[in-house]
């Protein structure tokens, strides 16, 4: 909105307007309305903004051998071994029984605690070394450590102490996890890579590295007779399923809303439209050359 975009519900969809539509708090549509009819077609760029992560289960909190954990299930195509001994942050929302929404972001500020998934020490990992890379870290062991201090005294429960801390800070109970959506992601900020700072290391570049320039291109574009639309889609990492993924009819419904407001024919709009799917590919890595087809790979230089 600081760039002049208004909710679709507040717009007449007239030439020059900049509008947005949020689909179930997960995907977003941005549009700059052109001077021409929508029946002449629109120009779309679609990128996804979800990335591999660890989602907390419905009742994730449990205690084992004096340590409190979150039980997780992984979202998207992640390599499980990359998520152990890595500082993790917690993001998401919790809906309390009274309907209050609580936004959660823990682990991004320097003063925040972080969370970890443990791994075996090298000198006791003989059996682990004998396993394949796929099986060395079972998904069932991706449990996130969240505390180790017992409640009140040494005989108390660590889990109970964690619940007390959560209740004190956020006013939630264990049952509130059922109506929560919480995810763990790497607690690492974006950094330049190399003496020449020519590369960027950051979580979620697939596909936010495409989403960001798509949006800035929309901001920087000149007025046009064509309506330009950028879609930030969800659920790509798990097959674009659900009401916020591209397998849904969300794009159709958005275009129909625009056409209905302007009296344009939806079928003609679609027939004359062009869509660019903006997603990433792996650049050729000489350290793993056998995994690539060298003549048809992207290169950094």
List PLM regions with ranges.
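N-terminal hydrophobic/helix-forming segments and targeting peptides
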Residues: 1-301
